[in-house]
């Protein structure tokens, strides 16, 4: 993996810009997205560009290995690296699917009310999966239980029935970019007593809701 990768990312205005990454930088971004997704209580922004680029890199690595001599030690090393990358990628995608299944009404409502220009939490494939999952859930509940109930009880509000992500849960994080005047308890009257600075490289245990924007921007990394 030595070739550079053209990566389509988000600029500061919410538009798209082409970023050239080395394969190592691409894998680092995948691992960052994976860790954040594992430890965040909510479904984070979709990263389809990263997923697509990593899959392309895996294909290139497979082609290179097919041309390499089997007895070469480098072949075994590259095979192990490929398996590691595949594990991270599949774990990342599984984690996202589990959150979609767990919070599907809220995920779909968030997508429905998403302001124009704001990054989506769902890739097109994930959106189709979430809609199908909701339709199947509604159909199952209707056929198994609701149709046997009195007419006034044959409806269920899945948005109210399914728990929301707990944004007040606490998460561990490592600071990647120094942040000043972070309000860690925004709901208190004496807010000035709860303002802190986050030094680069420091680690903290903080309420997720407080630092969610910093996770989205990449200023902090969940660990």
UniProtKB/Swiss-Prot annotation:
Important for GINS complex assembly: region residues: 166-223
The record ties this protein, via PANTHER family, to: DNA REPLICATION COMPLEX GINS PROTEIN SLD5 (PTHR21206:SF0), SLD5 PROTEIN (PTHR21206)
Subunit and partners: Component of the GINS complex which is a heterotetramer of GINS1, GINS2, GINS3 and GINS4. Forms a stable subcomplex with GINS1. GINS complex interacts with DNA primase in vitro. Component of the CMG helicase complex, a hexameric ring of related MCM2-7 subunits stabilized by CDC45 and the tetrameric GINS complex.
Return the protein name: DNA replication complex GINS protein SLD5
Key word Thylakoid present = no
Q: Name one GO cellular component term.
A: GINS complex
Instruction: Assign the protein's first listed, main location to one coarse class.
Output: nucleus
Known role: Required for correct functioning of the GINS complex, a complex that plays an essential role in the initiation of DNA replication, and progression of DNA replication forks. GINS complex is a core component of CDC45-MCM-GINS (CMG) helicase, the molecular machine that unwinds template DNA during replication, and around which the replisome is built.
- Which Gene3D superfamilies does the annotation name? 1.20.58.1030, 3.40.5.60
**Which InterPro entries does UniProt cross-reference here?**
GINS_A, GINS_bundle-like_dom_sf, GINS_Sld5, SLD5_C, Sld5_GINS_A
Q: Which SUPFAM superfamilies match?
A: GINS helical bundle-like (SSF158573), PriA/YqbF domain (SSF160059)
Q: GO biological process: what's one of them?
A: double-strand break repair via break-induced replication
**Where does the UniProt annotation locate this protein?**
Nucleus; Chromosome; Cytoplasm
What turns on expression? Significantly up-regulated in aggressive melanomas.
Give the organism, scientific name: Homo sapiens (Human)
Q: For the modification N-acetylmethionine, which residues carry it?
A: 1
Phosphoserine: residues carrying this PTM:
12, 16
N-acetylthreonine, modified sites: 2
Q: So what family is this one in?
A: Belongs to the GINS4/SLD5 family.
Q: Which CDD domains match?
A: GINS_A_Sld5, GINS_B_Sld5
Keywords tagged on the record = Acetylation, Chromosome, Cytoplasm, DNA replication, Nucleus, Phosphoprotein
